[in-house]
Structures are given as structure tokens and as C-alpha cells.
């Protein structure tokens, strides 16, 4: 009888992920304009964008997947897209040790 596989979580310290996210938001606020518009943002569309950014790359720095100039709403949707991709095991979020840089790669990319 087969046993149900336990969900696999990213091998990243949550505190470091939060710190990296806070750094990205801080940079976004430096280039923030005050034009307010209503914009529909698709998580699925941003999932595709993240996957395209990772194609052909062994690893990408976590910060490289975000463009602070696009504003906080796009950054938030991109983060949600990245976490959804990790949940669906399409990407891996890794960190060598505490306080080390965080990297993202396609889950099916050979490590070596």
C-alpha cells in the first residue's frame, strides 16, 4: 500500500525570506510614484513571467525576479506567483545557510 507523500516545503529560512521581501519593498518605495490607478493583476500571468525569467538559468537570485520600478502591487502579485509555483513544486527556493542569499530555480533543472 502506498503512503501519501508529505508536502515538500522550500528549504529556506522564513525569517530570511521575510527580510529579502522587506528589502525589495524598501527599494520599491524609493521609486514609488503617487499615481493611483485600478489595475487587474493576474497571479497566473505572473507565474508564467517568473517561469520565463528562470528558463535557461541554473539559479536566479530571489531579488532578480522582482522589478521595484513596477510598484508594490506588481511586487506583491509576483511574490504570490512565486510562492504558488513553489507550492506546485514547479520551482525550488533554496538557501545554503542562515543569512545566505536566497536563490530560485526551476524544479526540473539539474542541480549539477
Language-model features and meaning:
Residues 1-112:
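Long, charge-dense, low-complexity tracts
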Amino acid at each position: 500500500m502506498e503512503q501519501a507523500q508529505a508536502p515538500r516545503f522550500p528549504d529556506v529560512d522564513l525569517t530570511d525570506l521575510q527580510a529579502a521581501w522587506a528589502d525589495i519593498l524598501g527599494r520599491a518605495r524609493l521609486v514609488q510614484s503617487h499615481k493611483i490607478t485600478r489595475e487587474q493583476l493576474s497571479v497566473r500571468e505572473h507565474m508564467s513571467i517568473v517561469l520565463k525569467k528562470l528558463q535557461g538559468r541554473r539559479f536566479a537570485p530571489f531579488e532578480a525576479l522582482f522589478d521595484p520600478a513596477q510598484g508594490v502591487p506588481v511586487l506583491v502579485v509576483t511574490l504570490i506567483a512565486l510562492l504558488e509555483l513553489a507550492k506546485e513544486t514547479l520551482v525550488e527556493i533554496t538557501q545554503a545557510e542562515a543569512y545566505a542569499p536566497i536563490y530560485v530555480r526551476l524544479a526540473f533543472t539539474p542541480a549539477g
